[in-house]
Design a protein with these regions (language model features):
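Extracytoplasmic copper-binding redox domains, predominantly the cupredoxin/blue-copper superfamily
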Residues: 20-190
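Sec-dependent bacterial lipoprotein signal peptides
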Residues: 1-18
Length: 190
């Protein structure tokens, strides 16, 4: 995990830079064929989109090559400035931030951004795996689930997706363990 920390820090910083972009148009990747097939199952899938707005040149320069793979976006220094001022960067988000779903429905999280994200169910919202982003966002207590990530929990950009099933009636919380202000609350219904 220690060797992944610099890479994750880079990814986080790149994502923050993109969120602060002034770009008027964003090119979004198309969902994968598997995502389309799952979404076509009538009423069985609730879609959550993962957004960011990283500028590839400034994020890749600050964090490392390949951190940001989209075109245009927010410069890294602006991302850090906005995160420092507000504790979050609006372009880095899950949409919707809250939704209702039936027990047994599938939540399909699709990465429409240019950075790697996670879609991690947590008991309580908290910090993630990038200490600098935790500090700047005010999420200094790390969510334990973020410390137990597996390699396949990291969702690359380009329309890639992850699925999770609504297992019970009640509230389920999901966050990105790289950008911990990216969150959604799911209200499980019978």
């Amino acid at each position: 995990m220690r060797s992944m920390t610099p890479l994750l820090a880079l990814v986080s910083v790149v994502a923050l830079g993109t969120a602060c972009t002034d770009a008027e148009t964003v090119t979004r990747p198309a969902p994968t064929a598997a995502a389309d097939a799952r979404a076509s199952a009538e009423g069985s899938v609730r879609r959550i989109e993962m957004h960011d707005a990283c500028d590839p040149m400034s994020f890749n320069n600050a964090i490392g090559e390949g951190t940001c793979t989209r075109s245009g976006g927010m410069k890294f220094d602006r991302f850090i400035a906005q995160l420092t001022k507000r504790g979050s960067v609006g372009a880095w988000r899950f949409a919707p931030s809250e939704l209702d779903a039936r027990v047994g429905q599938t939540l399909m999280a699709i990465n429409l951004g240019g950075e790697v994200h996670t879609f991690t169910e947590v008991e309580e919202f908290g910090g993630g795996i990038v200490p600098m982003l935790n500090q700047l966002s005010g999420n200094t207590e790390v969510a334990p689930e973020c410390l137990a990530l597996e390699p396949d929990d990291f969702i690359p950009p380009g329309g890639n997706d992850a699925d999770d099933e609504v297992e019970e009636v009640g509230t389920e919380m999901y966050q990105c363990c790289i950008h911990p202000w990216m969150r959604t609350v799911v209200h499980g219904r019978a």
